[in-house]
Structure formats: C-alpha cells, structure tokens
Design a protein with these regions (language model features):
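N-terminal first-folded block
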Residues: 3, 10-11
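Short linker/helix segments within small regulatory modules
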Residues: 24-34
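Short cysteine-rich clusters marking metal-coordination/redox-active sites
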Residues: 12-15, 37
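Short Cys/His-rich "knuckle" micro-motifs
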Residues: 21-25, 47-50
Length: 70
C-alpha cells in the first residue's frame, strides 16, 4: 500500500501555530484551501474529509506526516 507523505509546511495557515501531530489540508468555509491544525480545521471547515473537501495527515514515529486513508 502506497503511503502519501506531506511535503508542505507544518505551520497552520490560519493561527500560524506549528502543527505537532495532526495536520489537515482542507477547503475552508471561506473558499480557499489551507493547511490547518485540528482546532482551526474544526472552526473553519465543514468538518468532512474526502474528494473536494480535504485530507488528514498524522505524524508517524519518523516525524513525517502521512495521509490517513478514510
């Protein structure tokens, strides 16, 4: 099984905090997509993931964010 690794920034586009364990790459309720921490994802999205909505990445033991399959 191929695992998708996140190569983007680990800083939340909304609150600018460094993301430590769970990262979301998702569409916001305002239209544009953003890299978000869990709190900002909850506050600024429709809280759904999938095609056209967003993806969730979880940090593994090597320190890489890996896409979590739905």
């Amino acid at each position: 099984m191929k695992r998708t690794k996140w190569f983007g920034s680990d800083v939340c586009d909304i609150c600018h905090a460094r993301i430590s364990t769970v990262l979301y790459d998702a569409k916001t309720v305002h239209g544009p997509w953003a890299t978000m921490c869990p709190r900002c994802w909850k506050d600024n999205t429709y809280q759904r993931l999938g095609v056209g909505l967003g993806q969730k990445y979880v940090k593994n033991e090597d320190g890489d964010f890996i896409k979590e399959e739905a």
